[in-house]
Curated annotation (Swiss-Prot):
Keywords tagged on the record: Plastid, Ribonucleoprotein, Ribosomal protein, RNA-binding, rRNA-binding
HAMAP family reported for this sequence: Ribosomal_uL14
Pfam families for the chain: Ribosomal_L14
The name this protein goes by in its record: Large ribosomal subunit protein uL14c
This protein's encoding gene: rpl14
Purpose: Binds to 23S rRNA.
Gene Ontology MF: a single term: structural constituent of ribosome
InterPro entries registered for this protein in UniProt: Ribosomal_uL14, Ribosomal_uL14_bac-type, Ribosomal_uL14_CS, Ribosomal_uL14_sf
Subunit text: Part of the 50S ribosomal subunit.
Presence of the UniProt keyword Ribonucleoprotein in the record: yes
Length: 122
């Protein structure tokens, strides 16, 4: 469950290291975002000499949350951290590599590029 002011790790090599959620895209009064939701975030920590800089506004899709994810078959998945992947306006990742496991729930949400770059899909 990600809400405004939540800090997230970045799971790609776009140049950002840490994000802070400031808005959840898709509904005017939604309080929480879950895996697969798009957020507007500000970069809190960035790698030097990269295209993305600190205090820049970006869009990101949430790929891991510490809150449990319940599947239809009864399986429950929980990750160790809250993480997101920085995306552009079309939904493609800005980085060329994805770090860590990615849930398969992203595939039907048209984030197939992120799923194909991921080293592990749970």
């Amino acid at each position: 469950m990600i809400q405004p002011q939540t800090h997230l790790n970045v799971a790609d090599n776009s140049g950002a290291r840490e994000l802070m959620c400031i808005r959840i895209i898709g509904a005017s009064n939604r309080r929480y975002a879950h895996i697969g939701d798009i957020i507007v975030a500000v970069i809190k920590e960035a790698v030097p000499n990269m295209p993305l800089e600190r205090s820049e506004l970006v869009r990101a899709v949430i790929v891991r949350t510490r809150k449990e994810l319940k599947r239809d078959n009864g399986m429950i998945i929980r990750y160790d951290d809250n993480a997101a992947v920085v995306i552009d306006q079309e939904g493609n990742p800005k980085g060329t590599r994805i770090f860590g496991a990615i849930p398969r729930e992203l595939r039907p949400l048209n984030f197939t590029k992120i799923v194909s770059l991921a080293p592990e899909v749970l």
